[in-house]
C-alpha cells in the first residue's frame, strides 16, 4: 500500500521518506539516506546514474584545461554515419538556455536542428549541465547608478560586446562559399570569438571551450547547408564532422591565395618597361607572375601575356608594338628576345658615347687666353704661324689680289698644327682663310 501511494504521488516522496525514516527504528550504523534505488523516483535515479558515471568514468576532451573550462564526459552515442550533418543533436535550444549562451540574444530562436558531435564534446544525458563560461552575446545590464550621473558616468565593460549581432546570410551556392565564409568569420568576431579564429598565418590565441565549439558547430550548419559546401569542405567534415576550425583555417589560407592572385593580375595588367632596368630582370619578374598564376590553376596564354607586355613598352621599345600588331601567333620567348636585343644595343651605344665625345673635343681645340698684361695678347688657333713682317696695308693687298695664294694658304692652314703667335700693339693682324680683322 505504501509503495502504491509513493508511485501515485511522487512529488511528496521526499517528505514521506523523511517521515518514514524518522518513525522507524534504524540501527546506529546504518546511513539514514541509504534508500533503495527502487524506492527513488525516476529523476532521482537518473541523477544518481549521472553522479556515479562522473565519479567512475574519467572525462576526455580535446580542449586543454583552463579555469573557464569544464571537461565534458564521453557520450555513449553510435559512431557517425555517412551523410549530411548526422542525426544527433549537439546543443538544443533548452541546453543553450541552460548554459546561459544567447543565440542572437534569444537561445530559443536557434533555427538549427539537432546535430551530432564527437563523444569528446557532448554528453547526451538530458540532465547533464553544460558549463557556464561565456556570458550572453548581448551586453549585460549595467550596474545601478544614480539618475543624476546617468549621462556623466558610463560603465566600461572589460570585454567589448555588441547588443545586436548581425547573423551571416545563408549559403546559396558552392561558388559563393569563399564570400560567405568572410561574413561568417566576421560574425564570430562580433560574437567575442575572434581570439579562437585562425589568423593569416593559421595561428590562434587560445583553444576554444566546449560551449564555444558547440556554438560554432551549430551556427555553421544553420547557415551553410551541407549539399552547398565545396568538395574540400565536405572531405574535412567526412573525416571529422565537428572540425569547423580546420575549415576556417583553410578558408583563411585560401583568402590569402585569392588576394595574391588579384595582386598578380593587377601587376600583369600594369606592366611598364622603358629600359631603366635590365631585360633579364624584367623577364624574370613577368615569368614569376605567370608561373604563380599557373600554380593556382590560372593559365595565361602567350598571346595575352604579349599584349599586356607590349601595352607597357615605352622609349626605344615602343616600336615593337607595330611589329607585333599584325602577328597572330605571338610567342612570349620571342618577345623577350627582341626586348633583350634592343636593351643590349642601347647599352653598347651608351658605353661608346663618352669616348666619341672625347675625340670630338680634341679636334675642337679653339681657345683664347688674355693675360693680365696690357702690352701682349696670347691667341691659340689652328693655323700655320707666319713670320711676315710686312706692313698691314701690304698684307691686305696681297690677300685681296692673289686668289691663288688664298687657296694655297687655306689648304696649308687646314693641315697646320696648333701654334702661338705673340703680336705687338702695332702688328696685330693675323692670317685666316678669309680676311678678318681682330
Swiss-Prot record:
It is found in: Cytoplasm. Residues 1-89, 364-404, 416-438 are annotated as: Disordered. The keyword Transcription does not apply. It comes from the Eukaryota. The record marks 397-398 as: Cleavage. Homotrimer. Capsid protein (CA) is the structural component of the virus-like particle (VLP), forming the shell that encapsulates the retrotransposons dimeric RNA genome. The particles are assembled from trimer-clustered units and there are holes in the capsid shells that allow for the diffusion of macromolecules. CA also has nucleocapsid-like chaperone activity, promoting primer tRNA(i)-Met annealing to the multipartite primer-binding site (PBS), dimerization of Ty2 RNA and initiation of reverse transcription. This is Transposon Ty2-DR3 Gag polyprotein. The lineage of its organism: Eukaryota, Fungi, Dikarya, Ascomycota, Saccharomycotina. The gene is TY2A-DR3.
